[in-house]
Amino acid sequence: MEKTMFKSLSEIKQSYLELLKKIDDPEVISNIKEYSAINKEIAKIREISEKFITYENILKDVEQAKIMLESKNEEEVEFAKMIIDENSLKLDELEEKLKILILPQDENDDKNIIVEIRGAAGGDEANIFAGDLFRMYSKFADELGFRLKILSTNSASAGGFSQIVFSIKGEKAYSKFKFESGVHRVQRVPVTESQGRIHTSTTTVTVMPEIDDSVEIEIKPSDLKIDVFRSSGAGGQSVNTTDSAVRITHLPTNIVVTSQDERSQIANRETALTILKSKLYDLEMQKKAEEESGYRKLAGHGDRSEKIRTYNYPQDRVTDHRISFSTSLKPIMEGKLTPIIDALLAEEQNQKIKESGF
């Protein structure tokens, strides 16, 4: 193991041991807020610390065995060789795991998310596919045991959505969905196509961390233009007799968000502000990504106009262009996204390893 990596792991382990002592302090136990905060910190570094402690213990056994090699007793020498051989393999395996665990973690991986899907090029077919993607993500979220809530919809007359915004809450939700941001292309014969021709349409997906109390987003009231209107369904039909829907325009960025699916104007306003905060935070992340490279761009913080995936229905194939990964389409559309997510995660880890220099 490289000295810089060993030093970094030693520092993490030391912090872990200090936190374990601290959490047993009666004063900390009596302070719920502090106790909870320390518990979270312990949880973040528990796995890497425990694995490094195991690594150190095995390393000591190997070093002691190397001393035994100088013994004149043949049995002791053979026993020492056996210990070295067995433990050297364990050390190599642990080192590879530690290399991944020590990599810089995305600060948003633990957060819940807000997802926006928009029909882009292709008219009705793009909107219909937006609906298909929403169904796919709903099934994936359900498979993971996550909770999904629709925040805002703009249903399309031919089916699907011209826009749909929804939240997903669950353990490390962002880490599971962050690779989905970008342009999704579909190739198939639309329902509206009478001559059986294959059309190509696109839908855009944006995955944003849901902002919690740990993130400060300053929004000045003077920067907001707030409009109220009647909620409407598909085709513009009014579904509410009062002006309960809310549209908020953030004047400095010209970001517009709407919410009309809640029962009251107050609830719609709160939902719209939640979406706006996530959009503003997402905008900051994109700016940072422009100054960086590698894994941040892979996770969709880079060029949002980039075509990331093609869904080819005639050939029953999905291809993720970022990693040249192809698989069967049907399971993916049923929410079985794990093969693609795992492949993207592996590539992210490879890029992090290259950038870290370990």
Curated annotation (Swiss-Prot):
**Which superkingdom does the taxonomy of this entry point to?**
Bacteria
Q: Where in the cell is it found?
A: Cytoplasm
Output compositional bias ranges, type Basic and acidic residues. 291-309
Q: Check the record and name the SUPFAM superfamilies matching this protein.
A: Release factor (SSF75620)
Looking up InterPro entries in the UniProt record yields: PCRF (IPR005139), Pep_chain_release_fac_I (IPR000352), Pep_chain_release_fac_I_sf (IPR045853), Prokaryotic/Mito_RF (IPR050057), RF-1 (IPR004373)
Q: Which UniProt keywords apply?
A: Cytoplasm, Methylation, Protein biosynthesis
What Gene3D superfamilies would the database entry show? 3.30.160.20, 3.30.70.1660, 6.10.140.1950
Ranges where the record places region Disordered: 291-313
Q: How is it modified after translation?
A: Methylated by PrmC. Methylation increases the termination efficiency of RF1.
SMART domains, alphabetized: PCRF (SM00937)
Residues bearing N5-methylglutamine are 237
Q: Which GO cellular component terms are attached?
A: cytoplasm
Single GO MF annotation: translation release factor activity, codon specific
Please verify whether the record's keywords include Cytoplasm: yes
Purpose: Peptide chain release factor 1 directs the termination of translation in response to the peptide chain termination codons UAG and UAA.
Q: Which family does it belong to?
A: Belongs to the prokaryotic/mitochondrial release factor family.
Protein name per its UniProtKB record: Peptide chain release factor 1
Q: Which organism is it from?
A: Mycoplasmopsis agalactiae (strain NCTC 10123 / CIP 59.7 / PG2)
Gene assigned in the entry = prfA
